[in-house]
Structures are given as structure tokens and as C-alpha cells.
Amino acid sequence: MNEIRAAALSDHLYNKAAFRRIPLSGTFELSPLCNFACRMCYVRKTPQEVRAHDRPMLQFGDWLRIAREGREQGLLFLLLTGGEPLLWPRFWELYGELVDMGMLVAINTNGSLIDDEAIARFRRRPPRRVNITLYGGSDGTYERLCGVRGVFSRVDRAIRGLKAAGISVKLNCSLTPDNAADLEAMVAYAKELGLQLDLAHYMFPPIRRDPSAIGVNERFTPAETARSRVRGIELQQGMDAARAFLERVKGGCAEPPGLEEGCYDPVDGRVRCRAGSASFWVTWDGFVTACGMMPQPRVELEGRPFADVWRELTEATAALRLSGVCARCENRLLCHPCAAMAAAETGSTEGVPQYLCHVAKALRRMADEI
């Protein structure tokens, strides 16, 4: 019941914040550096690439200033991400300052750097939640997808250690052809530990990392994405739930795949994106964007009060337009196209993301077979 009440309260706050253009939620992308080299990553850079970049990484004082000025504007929920945020040199110092500031801080991490000392630090200053991305169910899968050896056992120890310490943990999983064979094992693992596992079957083209990657990523074909979605529901909720999902598909309305929390309304399933109206994302090199999956709109942060930056971002976001084709499509409540998806798939928020069209059609075909 507490979780239900918390979710309802959070939704109420977000709705009010979006109406009043209050930056209730923010993401701090501390660094593009990561000890993994996942093939589908949208942001990762090597140290050499960071040094060659035309803008420096934000520093400790920069992040503190943004947090303090953001708090004055209504910032409460804060997500620390990367890259791998625990690699950032002053992570623990910044984390402590943010928690002491009254922020409700969550962390996105691959979990490989969470040892006993890290767990002890989290116990002293508990985060709102630690989100750990599970990339497979074995060391071999991690090596194939992430380019790292002997890591799954470390991640497993971290997850079990956090849970034993009473730290809130959620598992995320980005499904690709390289780890699809582990889906059943990952679902079983989450059930064994009694943890939520969110499956993302859709991989955004990494246009922030590589502007030429429009419509391209290490991902499933549309038909494979459709099958993966149904299989995930079957494994997590049972055959009856999978059949009910396909019945909703047949009716033309089903919950969207792989979107972040808060992207869609849990009542009617419609995408109600809060990016740029109640939430923001700060990139490692000092831009404020509406969403981390798209490079535009973005606002220069350096030397400007956060209040001015936020105002400019809300105006730029409100001016975004999606394709009228999508708005009229009979499958619009199956693929749920958003501005970030359209931009990543076509290069424009007004483009028609054909990949999603094909996923929706594949789901329709599956639904017609039941």
C-alpha cells in the first residue's frame, strides 16, 4: 500500500509540476565514461574522446550550483547517471551534498563498482533507489554485450548486498540480440530476489553519441521486438497476461514499451511526456536538455541562472511538433511515438519513425493469430 500511495503522490506532483512548468525532476549525467562498452549505448565515450571534445566535463561546483538553483525552482527528484556515475571522481561527495540538501536521489548504475564500502555509504545516506541495469544472466553474456569479463558475479553480489542492507533496488534490462537468450534466466533471477525487473525491448538509435546513427542501433528487427515484448510478458506475468496484452493490441491500445517512468499515463496508456515541462536532463558537457535521448532542444548552462535556462527550455520544448501522420494513425496507441523516438529514428521530431510502425504491425499480426 505504501508503494501505491507513493506512486499516486508522485503522479499528482508531476501533473501539477507539468501544468505550472516547475522542474520537479532532473537528471545529472555526470560523465560519459564507463567501465563497460555496451554495443547499443547512446552516450559512452573513451577518455581519449572526452579529451578531444570541444567542451569540458562539468565539475563538482557546477553540479552543486545547478542543484541549489534547481531546488529554488522546485527540484525534488534527482537521478544521477552516466556513463557509469560511480566512476566520477567526486561521486560520493556530491551524492552526500545532494542528499543533505533534501533531494530524493536515485542512481542509475551497472552495479559492478558497488562493493561493501559503497553499500555502507548508501546505508548511512539511503538513496531513493538504486537502479541496476542487468545485461545478462552470465559472465559470458556480459562479455559478449558489454566487452567485460567476469562481471555478472560482481553485479550479483552488489544486488544481493544492497537488498540485504535494506536499500531500495530496481533492475532494468536492455534487451538486444546479444542477450535475448538470457531473458528467461534474468526474469527468474529477479523473481528469486523479489525485485522489479523493467524490460526495454526498444533501443534508441544513439544519435547523441554518433549523429550519423539515425535509425540504426544494435537491436532487434521490428518483428523480433514484437516477439520479445510478448515473451517478456509471458515470462513475468504468465500466459493469460500475454494473451490479454495481445487482446489489447487487437483493440488498438496497449501500454508503450521501454519508456521511462512518468512518460505515460498508467490509466489510459497515452504518452504524456513531462520532459521540458516538469523534468530536465543536464549533459556531462554543460547543456540542459528536455530528454537525454535527443540532442535538441538544448540550452547553454554556463554563466546563466538555472531559472533562465529552465524558462528557455520549456519554451523550446513547447514549440516541438510531431508528425501529423502519427497523430492520425490507427496504431498510434500501440507504438506511442514521442519526440525523442522520432528524432532518433528520422533526424526530426516531425518525422515518421517507421521502425515503430513495423513493430506495431508485427504486434497486430501476432494478435490476429490468437
What do these predicted ranges mean?
Residues 37, 74, 126, 193-196, ...:
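Short loop/turn motifs at secondary-structure junctions
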Residues 19, 27, 195, 211-214, ...:
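Accessory C-terminal segments flanking Radical SAM cores
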Residues 58, 89, 150, 178-181, ...:
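Residue-level signal for the nucleotide or nucleotide-sugar donor/cofactor binding architecture
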Residues 123-124, 128, 133-276, 281-289, ...:
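Radical SAM enzyme [4Fe-4S]-AdoMet core and its adjacent flexible, acidic
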Residues 83-84, 203, 342:
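Short, solvent-exposed turn/loop segments enriched in Gly/Ser/Thr/Pro and often Arg
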